[in-house]
A protein has these predicted regions:
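A basic- and aromatic-enriched beta-loop-alpha substructure that forms the phosphate/nucleotide-
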Residues: 58-65, 70-126
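Active-site neighborhood of phospho(di)ester-bond hydrolases with catalytic His/Asp-centered motifs
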Residues: 5-7, 30-35, 58-63, 88-92, ...
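Binuclear metal-dependent phosphoesterase catalytic core
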Residues: 199-201, 205-225, 233-279
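Beta-strand-turn-beta hairpins that frame and shape the catalytic cleft
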Residues: 1-4, 94-104, 239-244
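Active-site-proximal loop/helix segment associated with metal-binding centers of metalloenzymes
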Residues: 103-186, 193-202
Length: 279
C-alpha cells in the first residue's frame, strides 16, 4: 500500500494569498500526524475538502488542532464529523485496512526527555524545570482549555493533564503492539518519540521536553515497522532498532526550508518497503 506521510500543514487563509496550495500525490492512503490548522473545526473541514476526496485519511490531532477548545471537546467534535467518512481519527485507537495496522494517539509528553544542560539532575527536578519553561513559552497553556463538568472547572490546560494523557497513550500503544498482527504495524503520534527527531536549531533548549518523549524502549521491544510523528518542524527519516521513524512537516510559511517533501509516499508492505516520492 502506498502511504502519503504528512503533518503540520498549518492551513490558513494566507496559503491562498501566497499561492501555497497543498500538492496531493498519488497514494492509497494519507497518514496525517496532526496540526492541520489552529482549531478542530477548520482542521476537519480541510481534510474533508482537500484530501479525503482523493484517498482515505488516517489522522491523529496535534496540539494546535485543540486550540480554542478542551481536549475532550475537540475529540468529540472530530469523532462526530468523521464518523462514516473517508477520514479516520485515532486517539488511543487502531485502524486496520488490508495488511496495514495503524495505532494512533496525540501522545502529548512526559516532560522528561534529556536534551539540555540539566540532564544530570534527578528526573523529578528535570521535569519541574521543563514544565516551568514550557508554561512560559508554549501557547498550549493559553489556548487549550481544561474542562471538568463534575468539578465545575473551566480553566486552561495544565501540564499534569498532558502527562496523564501521555502515559495513558503510551500504555495503549504498548498494549496494541503486543497483539498479534499479520502485516505492517505503524504507530501514528503527533508528538515525537526520540531525541533523534529534535530540531538541531533548538539543541539544548529545556522546552524540547514539550516536543518529544523517549519511547525508544517500546520501539526496540515491540518493533513496529513504522512510527510516524509530527510536531517537530524538520523532516526526519531514520531507523531506531528495527523501526523506521518518519516526520514530514509542511510547517509555517515564514519558516522557509525544513526539508518538507510534498509528495513523500512510502510503500507500507513488509515485503517491499522502498520509498517513492512524487515531489
Amino acid at each position: 500500500m502506498k502511504a502519503w506521510i504528512i503533518s503540520d500543514i498549518h492551513s490558513s487563509r494566507l496559503d491562498l494569498l501566497h499561492r501555497r496550495p497543498l500538492i496531493i500525490p498519488r497514494a492509497d492512503i494519507c497518514i496525517c500526524a496532526g496540526d492541520i490548522s489552529d482549531n478542530v473545526e477548520r482542521s476537519i473541514d480541510f481534510l474533508h475538502n482537500e484530501i479525503a476526496p482523493h484517498m482515505p485519511v488516517v489522522l491523529t490531532l496535534g496540539n494546535h488542532d485543540y486550540y480554542g477548545s478542551s481536549i475532550d471537546s475537540a475529540l468529540e467534535y472530530a469523532r462526530k464529523w468523521t464518523a462514516g467518512t473517508n477520514v479516520h481519527l485515532l486517539e488511543n485507537s487502531t485502524f486496520e485496512k488490508n495488511d496495514l495496522r495503524v495505532i494512533g494517539s496525540t501522545l502529548w509528553t512526559d516532560f522528561e526527555i534529556v536534551d539540555h544542560e540539566y540532564g544530570h539532575l534527578p528526573v523529578d527536578e528535570r521535569r519541574r524545570l521543563a514544565i516551568q519553561e514550557s508554561m512560559r513559552y508554549l501557547l498550549d497553556f493559553r489556548l487549550i482549555h481544561r474542562v471538568d463538568p463534575l468539578l465545575g472547572v473551566d480553566s486552561l490546560l495544565e501540564p499534569d493533564e498532558m502527562i496523564i494523557r501521555h502515559w495513558d497513550s503510551r500504555a495503549f500503544i504498548d498494549g496494541e503492539l503486543g497483539k498479534p498482527f499479520t502485516g505492517t504495524s505503524m504507530v501514528l503520534t503527533h508528538h515525537a518519540i526520540s531525541r533523534r527527531s529534535l530540531d538541531p536549531r533548538f539543541a539544548g533548549q529545556v522546552t524540547n521536553a514539550a516536543f518529544a518523549s523517549d519511547l525508544t524502549e517500546i520501539i526496540r521491544r515491540r518493533k513496529p515497522h513504522f512510527w510516524i510523528h509530527g510536531h517537530i518542524h524538520r523532516h526526519a527519516d531514520y531507523v531506531e532498532g528495527d523501526t523506521r521513524v518518519l516526520c514530514n512537516p509542511r510547517g509555517y510559511l515564514h519558516e522557509g526550508s525544513n526539508g518538507f517533501r510534498p509528495g513523500f509516499v512510502i510503500e507500507t508492505s513488509v515485503a517491499d518497503t522502498e520509498e517513492r516520492s512524487d515531489g
